[in-house]
Amino acid sequence: MNKIIIKCLLIVAFLGVADIKAQNYFPQFNDSRIKVKNSTPIKAYAFDLSQVSLLESTFKTAMLADECYLAVIDPDRLLSGFRKNAGLEPKGKIYGGWEGDGLAGHSLGHYLSAISMQYASTKDPAVLAKVNYIIDELVACQKARKSGYLGAFGNEDKIWGELAKGNVKTGGFDLNGGWSPWYTVHKIMAGLLDAYFYTGNKKALSASIDLADWTQNIISKLNDELLQKMLFCEYGGMAETLVNLYAITGEKKYLDLSYKFYDKRILDPLAKQQDILPGKHSNTQIPKIIASARRHEITGDQNDQAIADFFWKTIVYHHSYATGGNSNYEYLSEPNKLNDKLTENTTETCNTYNMLKLTGHLFAENPSAELFDYYEKALYNHILASQNHDDGMMCYFVPLRMGGKKEYSDQFNTFTCCVGTGMENHVKYNESIYSRGDDGSLYVNLFIPSVLNWKERGLTLTQQTALPQGDQTTLTLKLTKASTFSIRVRKPKWSTETTIAVNGELQKITPDQTGYYVITRKWKNDDKISYVTPEKLYTEAMPDNTDRRAVFFGPVLLAGVLGTTEPDPIKGVPVFVSANKDPKEWLNVVDQSELKFHTKNIAQPQDVTMIPFYQTKNQFYSVYWDVFTPEKWAVQQKIYDEQKRKQKELEDKTLDVFRFGEMQPERDHNFTAAKESMGEEHGSKWRMAGEEGFIQFDVKVDPNAQNTIIASYWGMDNRGRNFDILVDNVNIATEDLNRYKESRFYEISYKIPLELSKGKTKVTVKLSPKAKNSAGPVYSIRVIKEK
């Protein structure tokens, strides 16, 4: 037992076996908290938090690590900005990271959700006291403000005041000068609703209602054009939370308000089955789709259903990596184009947090093994892999670069969006292991050691499983009395020769149309289901490169560990050379209990040890491998090495890279502009400044070297594109994009005079258009130092 588990057990020893569930509300059977019943028939209901508990497994290890983190967070520090903005004296110093920046307040919402769920599972009075304290503090802030509003970020009164007047200035993450303010409001509202759902705190519900009413007042004077302009800025799950508030209160005004947060630009094409996702910020979109899925449950709106179904299939089958995650630098690319999108910034963790929520809603209406094949894949290989199980810290991105390494959050000085969702991710591993069918059946969706206590049926079901190290799962039933019902067990996609037996008797059945084995009988006390799901090694290719493959064993993605020193980009990441395409011929088992494998003389230039991706931490790795036949490798080796050599040379010289139109890079580079426009073409985003406008940003330089700016443009423009390039207000070049006559990207270099960079670590670059011209479009900026 490692130290983190011992520490966690000391913290939560008196709690017994904890079971935690998710922030998201999935329909429960005969839920008395819900006044508005579902218009859409629900076929699979969620179990209550108190009904499922985890047994020993890697999932429980991760859960305990997260509980440790939640235990050391100080509510007064998360509440600091709320009290300050309400005119009250803060009781703690505000945390760092995004909490000390423009998104202050979002973490409190996630934290409130997490500890509310923790109380629902454990009934620990200390946790309840913490929830109640936060609610009392927020109510005090609401009373002091006298408007119903709750917020913690700077300049918020001006931001909302301008919006209420109908003044809407917006970009992808900016609304009237504020960083995605509706995103933060959503997190607070969701946290309040969770406190009500999971602890019964009625003050939390009242506070959420007051915040929703304030929302209505703020946007009441905006016409549809202004609302749609407002929605260009990320707004989180506002629509979903308002639908849930409608379901709880029965007040239709909240359903109507949810439609005010309907982004026509994105959602209408999706309803028509059009993939308009390339170039879009992934995590901005997914909560919009969750709202559609939830609203369809309540209202039966067919438009919402079309959106949710099409989006899920599009993301899962055309935009996702082997981990089940999606996005590169937070953005989606062209469908089925991922081969050149392996970087340090792949697969934002928030995306998968939200995709699992969406999957849960779709399953409630139409249960299928297909949905949980994805859920399982993403849970093992992205969510579980995004946490350092030793200390509970989380990844913003889970890098898939060949030879990459995970970067984890800091306890008190990060607080990004993915720390917020991570607080919840790792305390909810039991949320969807089981479901209750509308016909009284039991769904077994995931193979995770756990106990289900189904009180209404008088059933306690214990699941013991060897997965993923072994292939046997046992379900043992304890019943207060014999009962006839169906048990539905998912047949996983990764296993073909499955067998299922009851009390040792093999069942001659096949999966039904949903992909589940259905066993209907009169169940008795101590009945036992034995389920064997043979695992094997197999590969999954990149959609646009069949020779670049990831290796799986059962549900688990394997990673090749490459040491604690960054591998050489040319020789440090092996390629696989084999005439045999079957991965079982590539690997030897080193330790089955740890799922440790080793390549058998097929990796060049050296063989590699492979382990579950979720076990990698503080080491470099690769999950994708370039696979060659010996004949192909003989031809390709020189070309392959030369390409990697050139890329390494460029990376070694690179001081800074700036991609336009992306949230964090633009913040990191102090991007400002006037009369600018933004777009996406040729798979990349661009910025352009019109006449009398400008584009300005900071870049890193070497104070003792010759620095060169490399700008990326697209040729064959044939319009007024003449502009000056200034460094610290000194003109270093004049550019005319009409010089570039081919329809392709051009990488154009501009040397920075030594006197402008000497002694400096950064400079300010400005693109200023000539009269009757524009500056740009410019797609990216790279700064290199010359040798």
Language model features with spans:
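Bacterial Sec-dependent N-terminal signal peptides
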Residues: 1-24
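C-terminal beta-rich recognition modules with glycine/proline-rich loops and embedded aromatic residues
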Residues: 24-29, 308, 372-381, 386-476, ...
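Aromatic (Trp/Tyr) and acidic
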Residues: 24-125, 129, 160-198, 235-253, ...
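Extended, charge-enriched "interface" segments that sit outside catalytic cores
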Residues: 142-143
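Asp-box/WD-like beta-propeller blade repeats and closely related beta-sheet repeat scaffolds
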Residues: 156-179, 205, 211-229
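Aromatic-lined ligand-binding clefts that engage carbohydrates, nucleic acids, or primary amines
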Residues: 486-492, 711-717
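Beta-strand-rich ligand-recognition modules
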Residues: 506-526, 532-546, 679-700, 704-706, ...
